[in-house]
């Protein structure tokens, strides 16, 4: 999902991703 570490690298706009 959006909050997975890999997707947080790719999709930094996700609300649960840092930065």
Swiss-Prot record:
Belongs to the conotoxin M superfamily. It is found in: Secreted. Disulfide bonds join 2-16, 3-14, 8-17. The keyword Disulfide bond applies. GO terms for cellular component: extracellular region. Expressed by the venom duct. The modification 4-hydroxyproline is found at residues 5, 15, 18. This is Conotoxin Reg12f. Its main location: secreted. GO terms for molecular function: toxin activity. Keywords: Disulfide bond, Hydroxylation, Secreted, Toxin. The cysteine framework is III (CC-C-C-CC).
């Amino acid at each position: 999902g959006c909050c997975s570490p890999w997707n947080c690298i790719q999709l930094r706009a996700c609300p649960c991703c840092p930065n």
